[in-house]
């Protein structure tokens, strides 16, 4: 029976029930709904709705129900209940009879689902933080293994300047650390308890909402009942944080897909994260990375979905808000599997150092060093930039690197060039000069890695 049937003289149509019921989605909140109900039983006992004996019977029955449904979603889904709240209440009544009908006193499904969802977000958010930390550790381990491998750095997907592979790894460590910080902030804002605010105007029973919040592990109760039952900022924020993190995952995946390509050949991926072709027997496809890149779009879609759902809703609760969960659940599922898969890919990744070094030595990646050399000799940078551009054009026409030019040839472009120019054109020199904080000089990369390893 529906929880709201007394007002109606006709049964809902089968189509409406199919359209309206949310159990196929919100069954995932069963643990939170039961935990919240256990806390609510204690709260209404303190204001005289239940006796202590009744409270204990209800709480025991709820704990039994939680044990029965853990790992058994089929039991919930087969019930035909409208939503997870209905399932829990109907199951409770089946266990303790009419006593179960007292539990909802002073409570609305509006504050109930808001509480369930925040509890779920807090729990799942902590699990995401663990996965982000594991990915960070995988990047640090890779940076340590391949710290001094030299590779070309890119702008516009054109070879630009040489960088250490460890520097590339630490760039993504920075990104994922920001993801951790963002999610931690979001979880702090979600750490307020909605329970006890009723449908929209607050509960009529003088309960201690601070104590209720504490019993559920929240930092504090919410302070405005209208806002409380209308608020889904935590859903939006977590989906937004996930979207930013997925952007970082997708960018890393794209880098690695390119590095793994036949055209680059910079890295090899383990067989366990790749697949083959049904037609072409030679293929080894980076499917794990491509799926990370692909799943990013669906996470973005869920963020846009919840923003669009919420953008014009009047206070307080509206049924539109039932649509908040499917996207959120999919976001968290997609994000978590992508974090796990990315860490697995990194753990088995091997750098082909000969190929990365050869690529770094091509494409005139030492051109900036020649310009800096001219500046050190007294030439204004803008003039030096122009001179080196002319040198590069000539080098391309002769199909040889800058360091292979005879001194006389280089002096034909700038007479201040001397024999010591060749010292600055080596890959080693290119790296070593980037010794300012945040640069790719190996001592800087080693220092940055050491600092990251200390920071947990």
Swiss-Prot record:
Question: Which SUPFAM superfamilies does the record match to this protein?
Answer: L-aspartase-like
Q: Which GO terms describe its cellular component?
A: cytosol
Location (main, coarse): cytoplasm
Q: Which Pfam families match?
A: ASL_C2, Lyase_1
Q: InterPro entries of this UniProt entry? A: Arg_succ_lyase_C, Argininosuccinate_lyase, Fumarase/histidase_N, Fumarate_lyase_CS, Fumarate_lyase_fam, Fumarate_lyase_N, L-Aspartase-like
Q: Keywords in UniProt for this one?
A: Amino-acid biosynthesis, Arginine biosynthesis, Cytoplasm, Lyase
Give EC number(s), comma-separated.
4.3.2.1
The biological pathway it contributes to is: Amino-acid biosynthesis; L-arginine biosynthesis; L-arginine from L-ornithine and carbamoyl phosphate: step 3/3
Q: Indicate yes or no for the key word Lyase.
A: yes
Compartments it resides in: Cytoplasm
Which reaction does this enzyme catalyse, per its entry?
2-(N(omega)-L-arginino)succinate = fumarate + L-arginine
What are this entry's molecular-function GO terms? argininosuccinate lyase activity
Which residues fall in a coiled-coil region?
Answer: none
The organism sits in which domain of life? Bacteria
Q: Which family does it belong to?
A: Belongs to the lyase 1 family. Argininosuccinate lyase subfamily.
Tell me the PANTHER family matching this sequence.
ARGININOSUCCINATE LYASE (PTHR43814:SF1)
Name this protein carries in UniProt: Argininosuccinate lyase
